UniProtKB/Swiss-Prot annotation:
Gene label: DDX50
Residues covered by the Helicase ATP-binding domain: 168-347
Keyword Cytoplasm recorded: yes
Annotated compartments: Nucleus, Nucleolus; Cytoplasm
Cellular component per GO, a single term: membrane
Organism: Homo sapiens
Predominant localisation class: nucleus
Motif Q motif per record, residues: 137-165
Catalysis performed (reactions): ATP + H2O = ADP + phosphate + H(+)
Disulphide-bridged cysteine pairs: none
The protein's name: ATP-dependent RNA helicase DDX50
Amino acid sequence: MPGKLLWGDIMELEAPLEESESQKKERQKSDRRKSRHHYDSDEKSETRENGVTDDLDAPKAKKSKMKEKLNGDTEEGFNRLSDEFSKSHKSRRKDLPNGDIDEYEKKSKRVSSLDTSTHKSSDNKLEETLTREQKEGAFSNFPISEETIKLLKGRGVTYLFPIQVKTFGPVYEGKDLIAQARTGTGKTFSFAIPLIERLQRNQETIKKSRSPKVLVLAPTRELANQVAKDFKDITRKLSVACFYGGTSYQSQINHIRNGIDILVGTPGRIKDHLQSGRLDLSKLRHVVLDEVDQMLDLGFAEQVEDIIHESYKTDSEDNPQTLLFSATCPQWVYKVAKKYMKSRYEQVDLVGKMTQKAATTVEHLAIQCHWSQRPAVIGDVLQVYSGSEGRAIIFCETKKNVTEMAMNPHIKQNAQCLHGDIAQSQREITLKGFREGSFKVLVATNVAARGLDIPEVDLVIQSSPPQDVESYIHRSGRTGRAGRTGICICFYQPRERGQLRYVEQKAGITFKRVGVPSTMDLVKSKSMDAIRSLASVSYAAVDFFRPSAQRLIEEKGAVDALAAALAHISGASSFEPRSLITSDKGFVTMTLESLEEIQDVSCAWKELNRKLSSNAVSQITRMCLLKGNMGVCFDVPTTESERLQAEWHDSDWILSVPAKLPEIEEYYDGNTSSNSRQRSGWSSGRSGRSGRSGGRSGGRSGRQSRQGSRSGSRQDGRRRSGNRNRSRSGGHKRSFD
């Protein structure tokens, strides 16, 4: 066992430490004489260098095991050896971050008792455990100062991510660059680290009232604040300021007077300072447009042009270095960006022609739900997918929707709002509280969609499909960050199914259609939360309730009494079933599975009409064909499900209640006419000619219904397109700060 080996090694090492200095020297001379007869020259020099004799050397297998423990996450064995063998080594060694070899070798020199050959073999094993990404991103591969490395490690960064590796060289060398990478991959540090190193390398005499050398423009206040924080976290020599609306002008004026090296901000407030003559951008050397697709859109393009036009001259190589970053870069961005770029510029695209544009660490789910049922279903989704401890963001389309959702009683967790009408000071308090876990649910508009880096977010909910694919990609990217996995759930109505397919096509993702959380899912999640809450109850408090608990056990029995208590603690005293197909309350989804493949749902209707009473069949609605054509699923009122199961007797068709929504071939489209047509066709079919006539009539009405539906969809699509065009064309009239 490793523990015994480690203890044995330490016990062996303790004996020579207690010897006097003269005894130690005498014994070492004797050992060296013996070693001439038993070891080759390499081994003799190794013994003299380390001052450790052969009777102290543990077998290599033991040392290898100890070193492997060190190179994983546990270094206790190494620390104990170090403390015992080197009295001057008082402080406990910190964890080795991500297998950083240089740091490991530097710290390991403190322990002179370790065998050199074993040390080298351990380094080789450490090399083998590093991934290709870690090797390519090792700090030693880049001109990064020790001070910056130390600050990066303080932020938990132990190597550069792929986008940072690809962009470091061009940014550090002063080249213009357009970079695209998925959300959550570290784009901010992609320009922050090399710019800081470049400025610190060429740092001039610090003067008061010095003009900024770096300008970073961001579309939202929240993103600007976060980018500024990232800069501040990795430099102590440079002055970093952040200007955005909703905050005091005076504090920003004081920053200008004291001198700024790196200025981060939103276009509106920076333009205000320029027009007032307080801010001088004539000394700019580097310009960064973060979320460039939004910065160059009509809503911001005019303000960006007003801010930086004085620093740019046509086709001049003396123009500032221009760096453009985003997770989404449509082709028009590249065309518009050329007016700011030098003739030779670099392009880094880690998305490229890959099918999937969204983050690969996010699972995308879709739930069909009528808008009136949405708050209640979202409450259940939060409970099952996030629990009481997980963090979640709910995106809504309007500020009014955000407020209503956050205040809805179905959202049991503590939720806070974030949108443009909230005062900036409160927005900052809200974001700080969400980061620190003071509350678990943030309900927001698109102000929280871009750039916010909160790795602990487990779940993103989109209350409806967004109007454009870029919004979906950025919203879903608020989870699954920094190597973690996440879930994004999009709610939709039947008429929005086309929007969902459009997002799938353009973002390169596939939504997994799921039903609302089942009763068992809710019970399991709530009971786990209740059990966890019991751990916080002190023994002193428990003593007060022992008599009552004993009385309950005698009356109800231990299991029933505890089950009732857990149900009450979790707030789950009752459950009302919902349709897995549409999320409607008061319905149960059932499946009717065939032993053979069926052509369409009419086969199931025929079988139901043959086996069940007409009254029972009339209760069935929303029938859908299952994947593989091996049956159907449908909804019945909660009161009818048990009666249908009791009436059903058929060995070739299996009627059951599924725990989760099965995979569906054809989805219910919100129109009951098709179900009615199929029912009437088959029931009339038993009457001969009239049945065929009824079927034909139903077919004609069905075709008319479908044509009307398509016409309505086209009109609805034109309305949505018109809204988007109006929004874009009028964007330049808005003021962004």
